[in-house]
Amino acid sequence: MSIDADPTRRFPPGAKMEMALQASTSSPNRVRQVGAVLVASDGTQIAACNTFPAGVEDNEERHAGDGRFVWMEHAERHAIFEAARRGVATAGAHVTTTFFPCIDCARAIVDSGVACLDTPAPAFDDPVWGRSFERSQVILREGGVVIRIVDAGDAAPDGERGD
């Protein structure tokens, strides 16, 4: 198996956004539901959402205040970790996500060998994630990940979103 030298060729922009949007609807996060799809070089597709790690209890206390930041895994890392659990190689993979990656997810995307990322534009004015997006954009670019900006709303039928 070889890694495609042009990771953008395999998927037109937004090809997996509908799948990522569908995955986001499974998120227990009460503030923001995020979905991600990782497509490995061998064609394996892994859809994930921001959620509690496997076996970790979902209870009220863990949703309170900043609890979701402590207890929940982000969709991008959830997809990467699921690939690792299944023994799916991520070198040269393509990731589509419904929300621009944070710093931690950007590092995971780079270090797992993801080659291309389809994502909505970063909301630099977001009060929680804006500053993180500035840094994650640098990490992704310097890490060699091709970033393609996709409007998540365009993928949903009739312009409706699942979050």
Across the structure, where does each feature detected by a protein language model lie?
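Zinc-dependent deaminase catalytic domain
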Residues: M1-D163
